Amino acid sequence: MLPFTLQQLRILKAVATEKNFTKAAELLYLSQPSLSKQIKTLEKNLDILLVNRENNKISLTENGKIFLQYSERILALCEESCRALIDLKNGERGSLTVGASQTIGTYLMPRVLALFAQNYPQIDLKVQVNSTRIVAKNILNREIDIAVVGGEIPLDLKKNLTVEKFVEDEFSLIIPKSHPFANKKIVTKEDLYHLNFISLNSNSTIRKFIDNILIQNQIDTKQLKIIMQLNSIEAIKTAVSLGQGAAFVSSAAIEKEIELKTIEILKIENIRITRTLSIISNSESYKSKAFEFFSNELKKLKNEIEN
């Protein structure tokens, strides 16, 4: 007989999240005394202290943190097994959680999500947009079923993921319509030193990626004039449209601006800044029919983009 129940694992997870017995009890629709009793019973059965209760502050012990990791995996597997059975019973019904890194989730993913929702309205679709690392981690935790990411996948996570090449994402150099370079179409590396740049902050993975490509092409990024650092692609595009400077932006993010003709795009002589977008999933998790349907929609989008 196991020394714990699924309900006790849910309780431990809620306590870890809320860091408060009363709030955790409310989350699970339990009384606070009942929740406290379940935690004590779990600790007694495991013969390990899981929760610190010092100075009215609730936190997990180191043993509690380790046990929580396994608890979350057990709960995720239980939920996955139920989904598999429902899948067999209901055919094209079910649920799917899709993940995406920031730029993809904002500009590329909505197209496929809209088509998927239209074609499979009976499937409950949820979306998580976050950094590539967090999305990959949530794939492994079975909180996300499938995702499209653009950043480099950390090696410690990548080994347990199925990674499939999706499409190439090119970064365009955009400038205001009023800029003297607007009629050039192609600029040299030397021309870059005469531009005022608007960029993401230096800790951004996209900023680091672009800088690395420029450095590989013998461009001294420290000599580029960065007049403004903003924390969103939308803010950067707006600033460029208003004539405040130039920027490197994913081509997927500027379709509207191209259509409205609010910016100009410049090519850099003999340089292309591209990255590979990847479709990732958990190598060991159950692949539902909803998963298969969504994978097919991604393949359709890939063919549309490449052709």
Curated annotation (Swiss-Prot):
What is one GO cellular-component annotation here?
chloroplast
Q: Which SUPFAM superfamilies match?
A: Periplasmic binding protein-like II, Winged helix' DNA-binding domain
Q: Name one GO molecular function term.
A: transcription cis-regulatory region binding
- At the top level, the lineage of the source is Eukaryota
- Subcellular compartments: Plastid, Chloroplast
Q: Where is the signal peptide?
A: none
Predominant subcellular localization, coarse grouping = plastid
Q: Where in the chain is the DNA-binding region found? A: 21-40
Per UniProt, what is one Pfam family of this protein?
Answer: HTH_1
Q: Residue limits of the HTH lysR-type domain? A: 4-61
Question: Which keywords does UniProt give here?
Answer: Chloroplast, DNA-binding, Plastid, Transcription, Transcription regulation
The similarity annotation says: Belongs to the LysR transcriptional regulatory family.
Task: State the protein's purpose.
Answer: Trans-acting transcriptional regulator of RuBisCO genes (rbcL and rbcS) expression.
- PANTHER family, sorted: HTH-TYPE TRANSCRIPTIONAL REGULATOR, HTH-TYPE TRANSCRIPTIONAL REGULATOR CYSL
Protein name, UniProt field: Probable RuBisCO transcriptional regulator
The protein's organism comes out as: Phaeodactylum tricornutum (strain CCAP 1055/1)
